[in-house]
Amino acid sequence: MLHGKSSIKSEGLTNALLYAFFIVLIYALLSTPFHLIDSINPEILNTISTNIWLNIFFFLIFLFFAFSFFGYYELTLPWSWANRLDFASNKTGGIIGIFLIALTLAIVSFSCTGPILGSLLAGSLSSTEGATQLSMGMTGFGLALALPFGLFALFPNLLKNLPKSGGWMNTLKVVLGFVELALAIKFLSNADLVAHWGILKREVFIGLWILIFVGMIAYLFGLFRFPHEAKKPTLGIGRIFLAVVSLLFVMYLVPGTLPNSSSNSLKLLAGFPPPTFYSIYTQDSDCPLNFDCYKDYDKGVAIAKSVNKPILLDFTGWACVNCRKVEENVWSDPEIYKLINEELVLISLYVDDREPLAKEDQFTLEYTSGRIRNIETIGQKWAAFQAINFNSVAQPHYIMMMHDGTLLAPPQQYTDIPTYLQWLKNGLSNVPSHSIRFKFE
């Protein structure tokens, strides 16, 4: 008898662990197609993430998700899917049955997880990590979902001690709705930057975020409620805490709307708002930190040759978050700023610029693999230039070189201040003896 109970308990433990494992596996597998796409054409995810109309689509999707969180409607997959899987799991049994139960959970919980997964997908496509970040995010999400279900399968008595869902769950969903609104603005901003519409300048973007989080503060303090909420919620510790954090965040944002706000460049948010030079206020330069930069390779090389200075070649993007982080958090370091400003010619090539090339400058490019690509925009030209000459499609990507193409240091990507500074010094110390020499004492 004891042996029988032990065997049943052991089987229950195994099934619970398998259940949790399959939940994680299902969400991880959802990212697999994006790795296949990326392996076929390594530039495809960057092309997708910076596509103007796709970013507008993501903007609309995030608005749709936000209003779902606000309770105006609920996102659900057809119940027939869940019912069929549930029937199949009961009929099949064993490992396959447990997998089908996990798949049933993924479908049934879609009304809560769908908007979050959509946000994760869109956010990952917009990052330089692409499919890898998506896989990590989906796996992490699956793990977070599987952990409590696995624990409850192991220890059913824990369910009795859980607080009942209700007010706190609704508050959390509404807060996520406001966050979705803020992220929606980010995708609209990507489209605006790439297309050069000039609609969402930096201060307008920050102003919209301020309005969104002020709205969230008002909701948390109970100044208004959404139609699906029957009664005014209780102002508990959780609501007060979230409201205070949101208020501090709004206070942090406000200086970013003012002219000459370099004293508060919102470094914690670097990469999310548009670049500082994309402003409603008059700027001395259309380059980061008011550098003198050149956005055409040939022109920049000619200038470097005429002034006898080495080149800092900057492969960047209008919608590149890590590019903004380097510009605002690394280049702003006084020592790095001085070296770039005084000792180098900065050439910034935007690989996601959708401005069409002049008809006579458009051409067809054939890769060594035999793949043929029509180069019709400025961004396509610089993306192909980077891929062919430097075997990379990631941004930011920095090259130190002489005007004749001599490389002064290995390429550098997204990194911290000490590493970037040392890289600059190493590159400048390798300038040929017949050219300029530098000292860093």
Where are these regions (language model features)?
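Short active-site neighborhood of thiol/selenol oxidoreductases, capturing the structured segment around
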Residues: 306-324
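Amphipathic alpha-helical segments in well-structured domains
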Residues: 165, 169-172, 201-204, 329-333, ...
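Long cytosolic C-terminal regulatory regions of eukaryotic multi-pass membrane proteins
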Residues: 351, 438-440
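Hydrophobic, well-ordered secondary-structure elements that form the walls
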Residues: 143, 177, 315, 320, ...
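Thioredoxin-like thiol-disulfide oxidoreductase module
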Residues: 297-301, 331-412, 417-430
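Detector for the c-type heme attachment site
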Residues: 324-327, 403
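Cys/His/Pro-rich metal-binding microdomains
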Residues: 113, 321-324, 399
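Hydrophobic alpha-helical segments characteristic of multipass inner/organellar membrane proteins
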Residues: 1-300, 307, 349
